[in-house]
Regions:
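Histidine- and acidic-residue-rich, metal-dependent catalytic cores
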Residues: 1-325
Length: 325
């Protein structure tokens, strides 16, 4: 949050919201009262779901002054009396209020990009290589687009689609993503749902062009892809660029179930795909003609971003260890 989102000033709220109040008495930082409210709200949500009909918000009283701040708890009591918050949570009223309020949130283009990048980086907390794959895919897309002389608008749409194309994998169990073996059909089908999950998450939040590019990243021009089995006539160059870039990056990198492909194998796969109609001929041929240049530039640029991410991840792990001793 501090380095990779528009929420730099609020980042300590997340850093400290699991730390007991009595351990933070000598720690002064902006948004400290809001952090205490967040802590109370989170535990109320957890208890409300866990205890169901046995839930009683007064349970928090035994922890006032130790785990939770007195003023934050007083605000909780006032909110319960004034707004009937727990009944609204139970009957779903707040979901409608939240959906309505989101419609009035106005963000600049810069803020939108930062939030998207933050969302993309969260995949790295689950599996670091997922962030690497996404960042490398972004830069391969950019280099292919440059060679094809795409407009600034088209390049931007591909960029945003590439940022979010794999966020659905956050919902896929790690033991399946990391499986060092051939997956069962049921497991493959589960992994395939990451596209639909991503689609649901971004539908209505981005322009339809961006959505269409992102949801087609596993489609193939011969109809052999998923989830819809689209064919060439139903797709466009922007979709083909993300498909090609994602395919190339996947082959270049090691996977739990196989070693990385070498250059000759990648070129053979793409050439065969052009002949069979699996890949868009113009896009794939552009990549092949400039293979070395595109890969070198894209991976150099990606490494700069990844170095920053890896440093932040190490810092996160150290902070986590300090607070869990």
């Amino acid at each position: 949050l501090k380095y990779l989102s528009p929420l730099e000033e609020q980042s300590k709220m997340i850093l400290y919201h699991h730390v007991d109040t009595d351990k933070l008495q000598d720690v002064d930082y902006q948004y400290k009262p809001e952090t205490e409210i967040l802590k109370v709200a989170e535990i109320m949500d957890i208890w409300h779901m866990a205890f169901v009909e046995k839930f009683d918000y007064h349970m928090i009283e035994r922890y006032i002054g130790t785990k939770f701040d007195k003023r934050a708890c007083e605000l909780l009591y006032q909110a319960v009396e004034q707004y009937d918050i727990f009944n609204k949570l139970t009957d779903g009223s707040y979901y409608n209020e939240f959906e309505e309020s989101v419609e009035y949130v106005l963000l600049s283009d810069e803020e939108k990009e930062k939030y998207l990048r933050m969302l993309m980086y969260t995949t790295g907390l689950k599996k670091e290589s997922m962030v690497a794959d996404t960042i490398e895919t972004i830069y391969v897309c950019k280099e292919i687009g440059r060679k094809m002389q795409l407009s600034e608008m088209d390049s931007a749409e591909i960029y945003y689609a590439a940022l979010v194309h794999d966020i659905g994998t956050l919902a896929i169990p790690e033991d399946i993503i990391d499986a060092p073996r051939k997956l069962e059909d049921a497991e493959k089908n589960l992994i395939h749902t990451h596209v639909e999950l991503m689609h649901k998450a971004i539908e209505g939040k981005f322009s339809q062009n961006i959505v269409d590019i992102a949801v087609a990243h596993h489609e193939r021009f011969d109809g052999s892809g998923y989830p819809k089995g689209l064919k060439g006539s139903g797709m466009n160059t922007k979709q083909a660029i993300l498909q090609t870039a994602e395919t190339v990056v996947s082959m270049i990198n090691d996977k739990p179930y196989r070693k990385a492909y070498n250059k000759e194998d990648i070129m053979e796969e793409l050439n065969n795909g052009i002949v069979s109609g699996k890949y868009d001929g113009v896009v794939a041929d552009t990549f092949l003609r400039y293979y070395d240049e595109i890969v070198e530039k894209a991976f150099q640029k990606a490494q700069v971003t990844l170095t920053t991410h890896q440093r932040l991840l190490r810092n996160y792990e150290q902070v986590y260890k300090n607070f869990t001793k």
